[in-house]
């Protein structure tokens, strides 16, 4: 019993000593790590900005941006916005902060920063550029046509606002081109849904989506494709009167389409048939 007590006491003593050794090691490790971290932070903020004017600090931050040091530039612009909220350089800082977020591919954040400038500083010289970059942010967020297209729609909305408010801006042509590109993507999504419904024999739903493409996205490549498939579907369903109406619209609206000759031939044949009183409707 005595030996057991002695051994147990020795064991517990060793455990306690080991615990204090670990504690001492961790304390030393924490102090070393803290010192190392402070050293890094000290080096990263070694530039003394305390004697610089607001304009000089802005110039320094812009220089960081131009040198593509977007992380440090972003920190500087945020600091300027916090420290000098009523200064004349606020819109500069706000705009470049948005640009930093955009260059870092933080597109949701860049959209937020550009929106703040447009909303809070409507008289700023940066509003036109901010409006374009807001649209660009949503454009970058626009996914493949198979996915949800909310950002595509937001991008179209913001590009259109840019075109409407700044019609003489040199970037209007680019904005219009991207509106067309995004509309094409939206049309492709609707068209693909129509095709899926058609393959599943949900003809009413399919026709509805084909009509939507023609009506809403009439200036995209998917409009004549949708009308063509609608005509073929109506003919397959023996709805000849309706098919003829669509054929008439097709040859009037899409004379340059690759399917024009086929549809014109079908139209002529169907007209002759219906005039002879052989309509199946």
Task: Kindly label every feature range from the protein language model.
Residues 13-14, 31-32, 42-281:
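Acidic, polar-rich low-complexity tracts and alpha-helical solenoid repeat scaffolds
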Residues 3-43:
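Sec-dependent bacterial lipoprotein signal peptides
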